[in-house]
Swiss-Prot record:
Domain remarks: The SMC hinge domain, which separates the large intramolecular coiled coil regions, allows the heterodimerization with smc4 forming a V-shaped heterodimer.
Pfam families: SMC_hinge, SMC_N
Coiled-coil intervals: 209-517, 693-949, 978-1045
The entry's keywords: ATP-binding, Cell cycle, Cell division, Coiled coil, DNA condensation, Merozoite, Mitosis, Nucleotide-binding, Nucleus
Uses in biotechnology: Possible candidate for an effective malaria vaccine as determined by epitope response in sera.
Single Gene Ontology MF annotation: chromatin binding
CDD domains in the cross-refs: ABC_SMC2_euk
Protein's UniProt name: Structural maintenance of chromosomes protein 2
Length: 1218
């Protein structure tokens, strides 16, 4: 099998389809100059074979293989190799063996995507790789590819390295691998033996001793456990006996406590009767006091009216301040609008150049039209003169000659005026020279004044800069008035909030409990008052009345963790002696008589015909409250299973439900309550204090107050900074005024000084001269115009007299043209005028709007001044009213002193009521203590009962042994039972157990037996490993023998090929491979002889001879592992020219079934090739010329084929460099 054709398309330097071939089955050569593209053919072969290392084909990425990397419009590159497989037997495997031709294509598309085709069908890269590797053509380990560097490498190889080449060819590497693996396995066996010995002597034997000891300890541990269990049983039996005895005692004490509770309740009722009697007496005193306090009521009424008036005036002031702020905002808006209009006017001013151009163009048109009209008037005048020789509308009347006379008179007048102006100007110039001389005398004095002016101007400029800086920094102080207004509004709001807060605070303080936490308690032990811990959700605010009626006085309860904390807090704060009633609620006392959950509520809703998710008609108290999730039990306790309903009917249906499980106490949103006992309450609830709402309102107002306080602080700071800056501005403005006045005075001095007077006269003369020059310029223009008119008239008279008819026709034609031209220009002038008028109209509109806004600004300022005046009047009125209020309060104080007798009686009655209340509180406290005692007893009863039940349930043996409890002569005799002695015995045993348990091994018995088994197993394994080691040593010895035999046989075969190849390449010379020191393990070396005269060293040879020797060895190695194709890249570079001519014969004789593709630069090499491809580079394109030589008859071949020389020229683009 051999390469028949290579087709390149868009690959490297081959932009179009290029067919290289046909190739000869044996010797093919490629030649060409450097840069001609010859190496690209070898790169193409490597590319198709699937080379991985792109550096070997001189690119970094696949895109670079496309012609000019795709920049010339070619985005795809492909290489196709056509193999001829007609020779039999084929080296290929199935299914390729019977195919005559095989085509492999590889394509690369810009972007790096590539694909393979095998016989025009898509193929995987692995299929292609397997195809070539089946032919021993592995491009990524290419033995068939010989580069120039490989020859140099072989020349410099040492004997051991040369031996390595033979080993590689012989396949003894496999022996080496097996031998190495066997040695590694033997080392592992040695290690295993060492490990087994180590385990036996260092682990197993010591472990056996250790486990024996652990086994004894474990038996002791089990015995101790049995003893402990016996003592614990006695102790449990004692606990059970004591708990059962405690149950009986608690039941007796509870009966006694209940009797005492009834006595205390009776005493409290009697105290309530006495309190009621004193309250009636107190009301009587109040009535008498009210009768005597009518004047006081009048004064109080007047006081309230004054306070109301002050409040009203403050509201008015606040409204006026708001109005003032509104007007100030309006003023700022007007200012912004004025600035906006000014900006627009400024924009028109910036576009003034364009407007001026339009205006100039318009003026030029006007002038042009006027000139043309004058010319038309002239022509018409002339025409009139020609037609009628009468008068016309011009200032000059009469015939042509009369007009000529008038023009000449006017010309004479103009010339006279010119002479007068010239003489006057000359006189004035002389006068100016005289005045300048006179001015020099006063220059010194003037310069001193001028210096003063410069100094003042500098000072003025500095002041202006400072003012500009301040105005920019503080935005022209526009915020000042706004901030003042904001401050007043905030102050008034805070005053109002403070009054509202005080009212709310008084309400809260009426129930607030002030307390201190003892040092032996934590802050978390006191949770706080109920009203602070819960909150009604905003969406359920309509339930507020119902919630307050349910909770009532419980809102003021102080919640603590337990009874002990309650007791400490009560005693520490001395609540019993205080005037305010304080109720402490320990968490453990919150006994819920009936717990209500969501499922119960849903059942109620279903029962009354509502949707189970309807939360508006039947309301679950947990849904409407905000609280800490840890306090859910408290909420259950507070509401005590009461539900809130939207109407009375729903309440009745739920409360009076025959099914008691679905019957609950209910209350309507209006406050009508229905109890399960059958009672109902309701009525007017107008005076109910909705305390939770007030507390939330208080918190909200307090937050508002703090927010306003922070805002006020911020506004005050800003205002202070602005006022400070404004003060600075006033000072600078005064300084600026002074500097401006100084400058005006200096300018007046400069004007009134002698220098200034003379200078003024000089300027007046200069102005007069300039004026005269302007008039003179007009006179010169008039003179020129009159001269031209006179000349023209004289010419017209002459022409008219010569040709009157023709003159008339010409004048008519000229007049017609002038009229048309004037009409055209007037149309253009009209358009220009409209454009200018639009711009001027827009400017005028903006100016009018600005003027209107300016007037509005003045009006707004006046309104603000009026409002400020009103605010001032209101504040004066407030101050006067406050003074009146103070006088009134003094009168009330004087009047109050006259009520001392009533007060004494009242104090006596109040004292009695307070004493009774105190006594009642003490009784209530005793009752509460008794209740707590009852709760403790009930708790103890429950604890004892629970203990009995728990012990009975968890220790089933109690049922059998209970009759023996506290019986003599049994293990459960409690007469001499001492808990501490039992505990000590148990403790002693547990201590011993703890010591044993540290190192106890509960599996010691099983482990001891297992370790004995392991010991026997390891001894058996040790014997097995020793036997395996012996077998491995025998295998290694056998491998060494086989390797030596195989290597020697390969050496002899390669030596034979080496001698034959070298003799073919170099006539009259012999070569051989010699074993170093008679031992193949020492390596081999190459020997050479000329005419049977063997050289001792290769150093005597030329470089070409040494290269030929290395080439022969490489080819001999290749022949051992024959492949269908060999590629040699410039291997003749190191060869002499006369050594290359026999390479063709060598290929034919030594490699009759292999194809050679050789890249060469030497004629001696390629001139003997069967087919020669010559590469050239013409006009940026590579060309390929094929030369097929006559095949001469070889000694090893009989086939003779006549091949005509043919030349195929393929134009290509610029190639890669070789």
């Amino acid at each position: 099998m051999y390469i028949e054709e290579i087709i390149l398309d868009g690959f490297k330097s081959y932009p179009t389809k290029t067919v290289i071939g046909p190739f000869h089955p044996q010797f093919n050569a490629i030649t060409g100059l450097n840069g001609s593209g010859k190496s690209n053919v070898l790169d193409a072969i490597c590319f198709v074979m699937g080379i991985n290392n792109l550096n070997l084909i001189r690119v970094n990425r696949l895109d670079e293989l496309i012609y000019k990397q795709g920049q010339a419009g070619i985005t795809k590159g492909s290489v196709t190799i056509k193999f001829n497989n007609e020779e039999k037997p084929s080296p290929l495997q199935e299914p390729y063996r019977d195919m005559k031709n095989i085509t492999i294509t590889r394509q690369i598309v810009l972007g790096g995507r590539n694909r393979y085709l095998l016989n025009s069908h898509n193929a995987k890269p692995k299929d292609i790789s397997d195809f070539f590797q089946s032919l021993k053509l592995n491009i990524n380990n290419p033995h068939f590819l010989i580069m120039q560097g490989k020859i140099t490498k072989v020349i410099n190889m040492k004997p051991i390295e040369l031996l390595g080449l033979i080993e590689e060819s012989s396949g003894t590497k496999l022996y080496e691998v097996k031998r190495t693996n066997a040695i590694k396995l033997m080392v592992k066996k040695d290690q295993k033996l060492g490990e087994i010995n180590k385990v036996l002597f260092e682990e197993i034997e010591p472990t056996l001793v250790k486990l024996k000891k652990e086994k004894e300890e474990y038996n002791k541990f089990v015995s101790n456990n049995e003893e402990i269990e016996k003592y614990e049983k006695v102790e449990i039996a004692y606990k059970y006996y004591v708990a059962k005895k405690m149950m009986t005692k608690c039941e007796e004490k509870i009966e006694d406590a209940k009797s005492e509770e009834k006595i205390l309740e009776k005493g409290i009722k009697e105290i309530d009767k006495d309190i009621e009697k004193y309250k009636i007496e107190k009301e009587k005193i109040v009535k008498e006091t009210n009768t005597a306090s009518e004047p006081m009521k009048i004064l109080i009424s007047q006081k309230e009216e004054l306070e109301k008036k002050i409040s009203q005036l403050k509201s008015e002031a606040k409204m006026e301040n708001k109005e003032k702020a509104k007007e100030k905002r309006r003023r700022e808006d007007i200012k912004k609008e004025i600035n906006n209009l000014q900006n627009k006017l400024d924009d028109y001013q910036k576009n003034n150049e364009k407007n001026n151009k339009n205006l100039k163009s318009y003026e030029d048109l006007k002038k042009k039209i006027e000139i043309l009209k004058e010319e038309l008037n002239e022509k018409q005048l002339t025409m009139n003169c020609l037609l009628s020789a009468g008068t016309n509308n011009n200032e000059y009347t009469g015939s042509f000659r009369e007009q000529l006379k008038n023009y000449k008179t006017n010309l004479s007048k103009a010339e006279t005026q010119i002479n007068n102006f010239l003489q006057n100007n000359k006189h004035l110039e002389k006068e100016i020279m005289t005045l300048k001389e006179q001015r020099k005398k006063y220059e010194k004095e003037y310069n001193e004044i001028s210096k003063e002016k410069d100094i003042e101007e500098k000072k003025k400029k500095l002041c202006e800069q400072e003012l500009d800086k301040l105005n920019k920094e503080y935005n022209n102080f526009m915020e000042l008035d706004t901030l003042k207004t904001d401050k007043n509004i905030l102050y008034n709001d805070m005053e109002k909030l403070q009054q509202e807060l005080q009212v709310l605070k008084n309400i809260i303080n009426s129930v607030k409990i002030d307390y201190k936490i003892p040092s032996n308690m934590k802050s978390t032990d006191v949770l706080g008052q109920i009203y602070k811990l819960i909150k009604i959700k905003k969406e359920y605010i309509n339930t507020a009345l119902a919630v307050h009626l349910i909770l009532g006085g419980k809102l003021t309860y102080l919640l603590v963790q337990n009874k002990e904390h309650s007791k400490r807090l009560f005693e520490y704060n001395n609540f019993s002696s205080g005037s305010k009633r304080v109720t402490l609620l320990p968490l453990e006392d919150c006994v819920i008589s009936r717990e209500v959950h969501e499922k119960h509520i849903e059942e109620c809703r279903r029962n009354v015909g509502l949707n189970i998710k309807d939360k508006n008609d039947v309301i679950y108290f947990l849904d409407i409250m905000e609280y800490d999730k840890n306090l859910e039990r408290i909420i259950q306790y507070l509401f005590n299973g009461t539900l809130i309903c939207s109407n009375v009917d729903l309440c009745k249906k739920i409360t009076y439900n025959p099914n008691k499980k679905l019957s609950y106490t209910t209350i309507t949103l209006e406050g009508d309550k229905f109890d399960t006992s059958g009672s109902m309450s309701g009525g007017s609830n107008k005076n109910i204090n909705l305390f939770l709402l007030n507390y939330e309102k208080y918190k909200h107002k307090k937050e508002q107050y703090h927010d306003n306080e922070n805002k006020l602080k911020e506004v005050s700071e800003k205002l202070k900074s602005l006022e400070k800056a404004e003060e600075k501005k006033k000072i600078i403005s005064k300084e600026l005024q002074i500097y401006e006045n100084n400058l005006n005075n200096i300018e007046n001095r400069m004007e009134t000084s002698k220098y200034g007077s003379v200078n003024k006269k000089i300027e007046e003369h200069k102005n007069e001269i300039d004026k005269g020059r302007n008039e003179l310029s007009e006179l010169y223009k008039e003179q020129k115009k009159l001269t031209e008119v006179i000349r023209k008239l004289e010419k017209d008279i002459s022409e008219y007299e010569a040709n009157k008819d023709k003159k008339e026709e010409d004048l008519k034609e000229t007049i017609k043209k002038l009229k048309n031209k004037i009409k055209q220009l007037e149309t253009e002038e009209h358009k220009k005028k409209e454009e200018i008028d639009d711009v001027l109209l827009q400017i005028e509109n903006y100016k009018k709007q600005k003027e209107k806004e300016t007037n509005d600004l003045s009006s707004t300022d006046e309104i603000i001044n009026e409002i400020e005046k009103k605010i001032e009047d209101i504040e004066k009125n407030i101050n006067i009213t406050k003074e009146n209020l103070k006088e009134l309060e003094n009168k009330i104080t004087e009047l109050q002193s006259s009520f001392s007798s009533y007060e004494n009686e009242m104090k006596h009655v109040v004292k009695k009521i307070e004493d009774l209340e105190k006594k009642k509180s003490e009784n209530i406290l005793d009752l509460k203590k008794l209740e707590n005692t009852l709760l403790d007893l009930q708790k103890d009863l429950k604890t004892s009962s629970d203990t009995v039940k728990y012990l009975y349930k968890t220790h089933v043996w109690i049922e059998s042994y209970e009759p023996l409890f506290n019986k003599k002569y049994t293990p459960y005799d409690f007469e001499n039972f001492r808990h501490d002695v039992i505990q000590k015995k148990i403790q002693a045993l547990q201590n011993e157990q703890n010591k044993l348990s540290i190192n106890i091994n509960r599996k010691a018995v099983q482990m001891y037996e297992q370790v004995q088994v392991d010991y026997k197993d390891l001894v058996t394994k040790k014997s097995q490993v020793e036997e395996d080691k012996k077998k491995i040593q025998e295998v290694i010895a056998d491998l060494d023998v086989k390797k030596s035999e195989s290597l020697l046989a390969m050496y002899q075969q390669i030596n034979e090929y080496f001698q034959a190849i070298f003799s073919t390449l170099l006539n009259n010379a012999q070569a051989k491979l010699s074993i170093v020191d008679g031992d193949l393990a020492n390596g081999i070396e190459m020997k050479i002889a000329f005419n049977n005269n063997w050289k001792e060293s290769l150093t005597e040879l030329s470089g070409g001879q040494r290269s030929l020797l290395a080439l022969s060895l490489i080819l001999a190695l290749l022949k051992v592992r024959t492949v269908p194709m060999y590629i040699l890249d410039e291997i003749d570079a190191a060869l002499d020219l006369n050594h290359t001519q026999n390479i063709g014969d060598m290929i034919r004789t030594q490699f009759p079934h292999s194809q050679f593709i050789i890249v060469s630069l030497k004629e001696g090499m390629f001139s003997h090739a069967d087919v020669l491809f010559k590469m050239r580079f013409i006009d940026g394109i590579s060309t390929v010329n094929r030369h097929a030589l006559d095949i001469r008859q070889n000694t090893n071949k009989k086939e003779v084929q006549e091949v005509k020389r043919r030349r195929v020229t393929i134009h290509d683009k610029e190639p890669d460099h070789d």
